[in-house]
Amino acid sequence: MSETSNKTRLEHDCIGQMEVPANVYWGIHTQRAIGTSGLRITDSQHPELIRAYATVKRACAIANEELGLIDPAKAEAIRAACLEIEAGKLADQFPVDVMQGGAGTSSNMNMNEVIANRALEIAGRQRGDYTYIHPNDDVNKSQSTNDTYPAACKLALIDAIGPLAESTKKLAKAFHDLADKHINDVTIGRTQLQDAVPMTYGQEFHAFATLLKSDLAAFDRVVPLLAQLNLGATAIGTGICADLRFRKSAIKHLAQITGLPVTAAPDPVAAMTDMGAYVATSAAIKSLAVHLKKAADDLRLLNSGPRCGFNDLNVPARQAGSSIMPAKVNPVIPECVNQCCFTIFGMDVTVNWAVAEGQLQLNAFDPVMVHELLTGMALLTHAMETFRVNCVEGIEINADLGRSYAQSSPSISAALNHYIGYEHAADIAAEAVHTGRTVREVAGERTDLPAEQLDEILDPIRLARGLGQTCRERQE
């Protein structure tokens, strides 16, 4: 490194020399990357990734010092720089595009250079004095982009699962609360959008909560997959340029730092090419999106009306719905959630394509995978918050209308099958539809069953509860 002016410093690499702004912590590799793609979707937009990468570098520095591979004073300065980055400092020093060629090399070198230059300052040296602390020889010692970048990506995804799971729990609880509130309010169930048999609003809301809880379990299963890392495998899994002891030491220290169940991949070469953890993570996120879309779709449909739709329930009015139709109010929150879910389906396709594109000893497409997954997780986290706060918690049911639907549906004739047979019950249902009367009224004329027994058999709330249990009691 040499000074060219008070505004720049001159650095060199295998391609040649380049001036780097004197006031930045990155170096020549980052400077070249900035001018390469110009997508303006940078690593700094994913703070989880930056924090995770600094954590990986800190664990590696501790391992290198423990094994006597790096001077303790240098290691201390490197660790201190990493801690600052983990705390959110220097966040503006990561300008490389997330989607990059080279399997994350630009991100790795950006991190190496920022750590090296900040460590130099901590050690009382000038930025760019790589004769003392070098981005490759010291910060990146015993490492490659190909083992550290995926490790950082996976830790970032684990970090992002936390708020996503918390939003899922809160939304599930909101549906549980609605279920408890309306466990005795009966309505009609529908299959193929046709009248089916009675159920309670509580059962319907409880089903949404149950689906969300299954997604929480899926996240729990994904974490151990993401926590299986390949540190020390370096370029292609053979561990070239790394001390044989480094792998175990780095994994140990990373587990201690993060408190996560970090383990070493059992087959380093296979782990270098296999991105199965990303597939599993994407699948879990997509499953959540499917269930959210189901809930949003159903609420939107049940909210239809108010005169010519189902009108089973009302979602909160949040905005005027039309520039031409007075008093029209749209279900804007369910529709917003739907669009977020559509985006997640696209995310899943992208991730699966990227995973499938791994060739020979390396998959070069981690950058787009982690970008899509982190973006999708943040999107769903916020979508569930607005769904809960601005929609679900304010839902009001139209209990009288729901009860009328349940009592007047011809499908409750199914309850008569056991007593008079399917064909006779079907005839009663058909006559009820044709004459506009209820099944109870027609059955009173066309069967010998006593009135009290008919009232009991065709009681909508009894039919909804099966053997007299609430949905929660049955589940327990």
Pin down the residues of each PLM region.
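Conserved, well-structured ligand/cofactor-binding cores
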Residues: S2-E476
